[in-house]
């Protein structure tokens, strides 16, 4: 906990002391990895009517703690002070509270001697953006994150996760975690020798060593390290000579209790054109899958990135990005950067409409942008009514029901507000749209045929 801050306020000193005990208990119970991920930046704000108010750094962290740990935190508070009846977690400081920040000592890169940095370091191959502090943790990457932290924090000893094998699709955070391991070790254990390298570069260096008759030097370089991290191991599939050298390097390091971290786009068992003896060894330690992102994780990543960049983005834009850019984290962050850059260069305000226009090509490559007009045309055609009936006030069932379905689909498939949807349907107000959506939802509970019909319409529109 030496790297954390304790936040004090000018009110409720007794509760401040209790919070310091609770924080220590959370650290002791969950360990450093989980503590740093979720609790280290949660601050005590104040107490009011036997309610303790805590402040989380982002909405994502707040919601995660509420869903996973709120009861544990409350019980710990009550253990020290039974007058506490509830806790509240917010994301903004309350007016009238002044905070005193007590900084506890923390080691930074500036504290590391220049000779330490210059002696066979890997800083030139590590991306400064990829640290544990700015890696957003969620259900899809929890295991991989915890395992990577354990490797980094092993303080010279080999972790139980040896080798650590991280696998998953492109842009989901595998490389980020490997860089974070490198930064952490070099910051906290600078005497340890670490090499991070792509499998492609490993192969090219091996080929160069063969050509220049420097194989012995090559072997000494890679077999004398404390931690060897090889990214995208799938690259050596089908390359027999490189596989042979990797196999012997792997064995030497593992036999000498040195740590290996390997990433891949698939699990060891799914690798083709690679020797079985290598495949089996890759699964010796911990195999951690980095899953595709969830909406909640994408929201957390965006909030974290926006906080780092110190910019203001409207909530509807953040929700839109989290909903529409679903392929990987790299593309999500790229989309956010593009929106911010466009605003900076054109001096235009960031709005949902501007965002949709800026990202039109990217969104089209992921999924076509569905408009209310698209929905109206498709539903009108499906039910054999005139397109003009969508904006009319006709109450005949054969017209009103398709119109209600179109409103329901407009809410489900577009980011438009109820008021905006209403305007597209003959300037109807938002309560009319709300009634239509509620009516369709009620019908869907029991009408299997309608449910299938709407599912079919959704597929047609999305494809």
UniProtKB/Swiss-Prot annotation:
InterPro entries: AAA+_ATPase, Chromosome_initiator_DnaA, Chromosome_initiator_DnaA-like, Chromosome_initiator_DnaA_CS, DnaA_C, DnaA_dom, DnaA_N_dom, DnaA_N_sf. Residues 83-124 are annotated as: Domain II. Domain I is involved in oligomerization and binding regulators, domain II is flexibile and of varying length in different bacteria, domain III forms the AAA+ region, while domain IV binds dsDNA. GO terms for biological process: DNA replication initiation; regulation of DNA replication. It comes from the Bacteria. GO terms for molecular function: ATP binding; ATP hydrolysis activity; DNA replication origin binding; lipid binding. PANTHER family: CHROMOSOMAL REPLICATION INITIATOR PROTEIN DNAA. Residues 1-83 are annotated as: Domain I, interacts with DnaA modulators. It holds the Pfam family Bac_DnaA. Oligomerizes as a right-handed, spiral filament on DNA at oriC. HAMAP family: DnaA_bact. One of its GO terms (cellular component) is plasma membrane. The keyword Transmembrane helix does not apply. The gene is dnaA. Its main location: cytoplasm. This is Chromosomal replication initiator protein DnaA. Residues 344-463 are annotated as: Domain IV, binds dsDNA. It comes from Rickettsia felis (strain ATCC VR-1525 / URRWXCal2) (Rickettsia azadi). Belongs to the DnaA family. The keyword Cytoplasm applies. Keywords: ATP-binding, Cytoplasm, DNA replication, DNA-binding, Lipid-binding, Nucleotide-binding. Residues 125-343 are annotated as: Domain III, AAA+ region.
């Amino acid at each position: 906990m030496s790297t954390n801050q304790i936040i004090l306020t000018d009110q409720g000193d007794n509760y401040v002391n209790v919070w310091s005990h609770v924080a220590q208990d959370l650290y002791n119970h969950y360990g450093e990895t989980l503590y740093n991920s979720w609790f280290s930046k949660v601050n005590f704000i104040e107490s009011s009517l036997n309610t303790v108010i805590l402040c989380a750094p982002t909405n994502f962290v707040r919601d995660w703690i509420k869903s996973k740990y709120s009861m544990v935190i409350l019980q710990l508070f009550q253990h020290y002070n039974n007058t506490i009846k509830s806790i509240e977690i917010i994301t903004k400081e309350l007016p009238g509270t002044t905070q005193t920040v007590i900084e506890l000592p923390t080691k930074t890169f500036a504290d590391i001697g220049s000779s330490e940095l210059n002696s066979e370091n890997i800083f030139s191959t590590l991306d400064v953006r990829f640290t544990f502090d700015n890696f957003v943790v969620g259900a899809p990457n929890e295991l991989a994150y915890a395992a990577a932290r354990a490797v980094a924090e092993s303080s010279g000893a080999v972790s139980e996760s040896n080798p650590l094998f991280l696998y998953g699709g492109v842009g989901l955070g595998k490389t980020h975690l490997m860089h974070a391991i490198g930064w952490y070790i070099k910051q906290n254990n600078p005497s340890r020798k670490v090499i991070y390298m792509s499998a492609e570069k490993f192969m090219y260096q091996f080929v160069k060593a063969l050509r220049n008759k420097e194989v012995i030097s090559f072997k000494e370089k890679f077999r004398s390290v404390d931690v060897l991290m090889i990214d995208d191991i799938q690259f050596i599939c089908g390359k027999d000579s490189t596989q042979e050298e990797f196999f012997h390097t792997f064995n030497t390091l593992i036999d000498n209790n040195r740590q290996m971290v390997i990433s891949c786009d698939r699990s060891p068992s799914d690798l083709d054109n690679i020797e079985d003896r290598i495949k089996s060894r890759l699964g010796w330690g911990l195999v951690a899958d980095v899953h595709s992102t969830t909406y909640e994780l994408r929201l957390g990543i965006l909030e974290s990135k926006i906080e780092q960049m110190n910019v203001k983005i409207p909530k509807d834009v953040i929700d839109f990005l989290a909903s529409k850019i679903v392929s990987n984290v790299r593309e999500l962050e790229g989309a956010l950067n593009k929106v911010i850059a466009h605003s900076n260069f054109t001096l235009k305000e960031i709005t949902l409409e501007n965002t949709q226009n800026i990202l039109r090509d990217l969104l089209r490559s992921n999924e076509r942008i569905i408009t209310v007009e698209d929905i109206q045309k498709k539903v009108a055609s499906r039910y054999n009514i005139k397109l003009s009936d969508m904006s009319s006030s006709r109450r005949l069932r054969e017209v009103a029901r398709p119109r209600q379905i179109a409103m329901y689909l407009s809410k489900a498939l577009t980011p438009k507000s109820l008021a905006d949807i209403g305007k597209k349907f003959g300037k109807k107000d938002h309560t009319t749209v709300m009634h239509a959506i509620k009516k369709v939802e009620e019908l869907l509970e029991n009408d299997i045929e309608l449910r299938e019909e709407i599912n079919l319409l959704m597929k047609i529109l999305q494809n």
